[in-house]
């Protein structure tokens, strides 16, 4: 009897071990990624993921043209098909500013403020099986996970892996950097051809994992159908390690590229020049003034001071600048500041 019981228990234990191995093989990288989430400062968290980032599967489906569809795909990927939810994303407008400069020794730096009515930022450091290593940021409130949601506790941390599919800004190991900013009006872009569909924020993740420089990024943008997030117009600030800096805008569903080191929340292209520029908003002018004063040459401290000077304070109904990034494109790395806490830098490097 004891021998039979021992055999049964060993058999059950063997099945449990096999089941555990199968679960780990399927979910291991995701579980490890979720457990990596740590709080850096008020309103800012960091997590790291290594493995299949889900983008090959997304593109194989032809992409998605809405944030809700993309969010549902993200949750399905995280559950490995065992859960298929209906997700409703939030639609709030946001501000922002960006500036790219050179250093005295020929390097390239890019600064960026993300301004939003409310936000909790999660830094996603992704080392994908296929593609470039990236460090990106997203606002978890974008997905509408619920009031007072924070990336704390395993369940919430796991949900934050949706950030694999969306980014508001970021840099890759090749020194390509991109930031998404509101463009100044509510005219949406919805390109509908036979190309794969991506939303504004999904395209950032896709480009950073597949493009080494601005030229390659523009080719990738031309290879997809762009769809506006949050029911509004967007434009990209995009720079690379060579020093090329462009603004990508969309007019009548056509991509327009403008060479510019600075950007805020109004159009720069000739077709809609200054649309969205409001009285009293001098952030863009102040950035351009600093470029002229310095001839576009600054060190990291000077760029940080410059981008901090156009950050936005909190006011009623508006959080202000949720996070600031200062990126080194020549030696790919990024320093974050949360909620204008410019005395509390958080530095991360790529190419590990």
Language-model features: locations:
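Structured loops at beta-to-helix junctions and adjacent beta-edge loops in soluble globular domains
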Residues: 113, 174, 181-183, 239-241, ...
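Charge-rich, low-complexity intrinsically disordered segments
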Residues: 263-306
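Extended amphipathic alpha-helical segments with heptad-repeat/coiled-coil character used for oligomerization
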Residues: 231-272, 278
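N-terminal mature-domain region immediately after signal-peptide cleavage
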Residues: 5-205, 209, 298-352
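Phosphate-interacting basic helix/loop segments used at nucleotide- and nucleic-acid interfaces
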Residues: 220, 228-229
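A short secondary-structure junction signal
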Residues: 122, 189-192, 219, 247-251, ...
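Short N-terminal edge-element motif at the start of the domain
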Residues: 208-211, 216-219
């Amino acid at each position: 009897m004891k021998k039979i019981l021992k055999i049964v228990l060993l058999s059950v234990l063997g099945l449990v071990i096999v089941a555990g191995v199968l679960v780990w093989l399927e979910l291991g990288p995701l579980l490890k990624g979720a457990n990596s989430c740590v709080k850096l400062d008020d309103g800012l968290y960091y997590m790291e993921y290594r493995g299949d980032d889900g983008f090959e599967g997304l593109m194989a489906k032809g992409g998605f043209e809405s944030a809700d569809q993309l969010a549902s795909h993200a949750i399905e990927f995280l559950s490995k098909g065992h859960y298929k939810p209906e997700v409703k994303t939030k639609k709030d407008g946001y501000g922002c500013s960006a500036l790219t400069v050179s250093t005295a020794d020929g390097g390239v730096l890019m600064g960026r403020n993300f301004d939003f009515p409310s936000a909790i930022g999660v830094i996603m450091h992704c080392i994908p099986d296929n593609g470039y290593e990236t460090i990106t940021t997203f606002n978890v409130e974008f997905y509408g996970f619920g009031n007072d949601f924070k990336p704390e506790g395993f369940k919430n941390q796991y949900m934050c892996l949706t950030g694999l599919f969306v980014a508001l800004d970021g840099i890759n190991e090749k020194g390509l950097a991109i930031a998404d900013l509101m463009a100044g009006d509510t005219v949406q872009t919805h390109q509908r051809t036979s190309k794969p569909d991506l939303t504004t924020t999904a395209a950032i993740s896709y480009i950073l994992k597949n493009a080494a420089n601005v030229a390659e990024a523009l080719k990738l943008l031309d290879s997809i159908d762009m769809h506006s997030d949050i029911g509004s117009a967007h434009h990209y600030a995009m720079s690379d390690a060579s020093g090329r800096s462009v603004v990508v805008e969309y007019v009548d569903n056509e991509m327009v590229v403008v060479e510019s080191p600075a950007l805020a929340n109004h159009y720069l292209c000739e077709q809609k020049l200054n649309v969205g520029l409001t009285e009293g908003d001098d952030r863009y002018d102040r950035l351009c003034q600093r470029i002229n004063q310095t001839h576009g040459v600054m060190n990291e401290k000077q760029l940080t001071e410059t981008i901090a000077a156009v950050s936005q304070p909190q006011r009623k109904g508006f959080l202000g600048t949720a996070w600031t990034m200062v990126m080194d494109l020549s030696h790919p790395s990024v320093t974050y500041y949360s909620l204008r806490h410019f005395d509390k830098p958080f530095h991360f490097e790529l190419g590990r």
